[in-house]
Amino acid sequence: MAQDQGEKENPMRELRIRKLCLNICVGESGDRLTRAAKVLEQLTGQTPVFSKARYTVRSFGIRRNEKIAVHCTVRGAKAEEILEKGLKVREYELRKNNFSDTGNFGFGIQEHIDLGIKYDPSIGIYGLDFYVVLGRPGFSIADKKRRTGCIGAKHRISKEEAMRWFQQKYDGIILPGK
C-alpha cells in the first residue's frame, strides 16, 4: 500500500538545524572586542558571550584567561534566517572540507557588512565564523541530564547526508576540497 501512494519519508529521519554558532575571534581584549560584541548583538538580537584564551602565547601577545573572542548561539527560525544571509554572501558555495564527519558544517565570511548590517565607522569591519550543527528528532536524548541515551549508528548524520541536505535545501554547490 505504501508503494501505491509513493514512498513516504520517515519524519524522524528529517534533517534540521539544531543551532547556529557565530564566532568573532579578535585575538585581544579591550575596545576591539567590545565592538565585535556589538556587531554580534546587532546581527542576532542576543547578548553574546566572551571566550577566554586557554593558555599564554607570547608571540601573539595573548595571556591565559584573557578575553579574546566573542560568540553567540542562535536557534530556530532566526538561525535559518542568519544562515541564509551568510550563505548568500558565500554565493551558496561550500567546499567538501567545510563538512565534518559528524554531519555539521562551517564557513567564514570576511566582512560583517555583507550580511546587511549598515557600516558604522566607530565599530569597524569584522569577519565572522558560522558553524551549523544539524540534527534529527530524537537527538535530545544524548543531551539530557537524567537517563542519557545514545544515538544509534543508523540515526547519526554522515558527511554525505549533510552535503545532500545542503544541496537540496539551499540549492548549494559543493566544490572539491583543497
UniProtKB/Swiss-Prot annotation:
Residue list for modification N6-acetyllysine: 52, 85
InterPro entries: Ribosomal_uL5, Ribosomal_uL5_C, Ribosomal_uL5_CS, Ribosomal_uL5_dom_sf, Ribosomal_uL5_N
Main localization of the protein described in the UniProt heading: nucleus
Keywords: Acetylation, Cytoplasm, Diamond-Blackfan anemia, Disease variant, Isopeptide bond, Nucleus, Phosphoprotein, Ribonucleoprotein, Ribosomal protein, RNA-binding, rRNA-binding, Ubl conjugation
A single GO molecular function term of this UniProt record: 5S rRNA binding
GO cellular component, one term: cytosolic ribosome
Compartments reported by the entry: Nucleus, Nucleolus; Cytoplasm
Modified residues (Phosphothreonine): 44, 47
GO biological process: cytoplasmic translation; negative regulation of proteasomal ubiquitin-dependent protein catabolic process; negative regulation of protein neddylation; negative regulation of ubiquitin protein ligase activity; negative regulation of ubiquitin-dependent protein catabolic process; positive regulation of gene expression; positive regulation of protein binding; positive regulation of signal transduction by p53 class mediator
Disease listed for this protein: Diamond-Blackfan anemia 7: A form of Diamond-Blackfan anemia, a congenital non-regenerative hypoplastic anemia that usually presents early in infancy. Diamond-Blackfan anemia is characterized by a moderate to severe macrocytic anemia, erythroblastopenia, and an increased risk of malignancy. 30 to 40% of Diamond-Blackfan anemia patients present with short stature and congenital anomalies, the most frequent being craniofacial (Pierre-Robin syndrome and cleft palate), thumb and urogenital anomalies.
Family as reported in the entry's similarity comment: Belongs to the universal ribosomal protein uL5 family.
Annotated function: Component of the ribosome, a large ribonucleoprotein complex responsible for the synthesis of proteins in the cell. The small ribosomal subunit (SSU) binds messenger RNAs (mRNAs) and translates the encoded message by selecting cognate aminoacyl-transfer RNA (tRNA) molecules. The large subunit (LSU) contains the ribosomal catalytic site termed the peptidyl transferase center (PTC), which catalyzes the formation of peptide bonds, thereby polymerizing the amino acids delivered by tRNAs into a polypeptide chain.
Subunit structure: Component of the large ribosomal subunit (LSU). Part of the 5S RNP complex, which is a LSU subcomplex composed of the 5S RNA, RPL5 and RPL11. Component of a hexameric 5S RNP precursor complex, composed of 5S RNA, RRS1, RPF2/BXDC1, RPL5, RPL11 and HEATR3; this complex acts as a precursor for ribosome assembly. Interacts with PML. Interacts with MDM2 (via its RanBP2-type zinc finger domain); negatively regulates MDM2-mediated TP53 ubiquitination and degradation. Interacts with NOP53; retains RPL11 into the nucleolus.
Protein name: Large ribosomal subunit protein uL5
Gene, per the UniProt record: RPL11
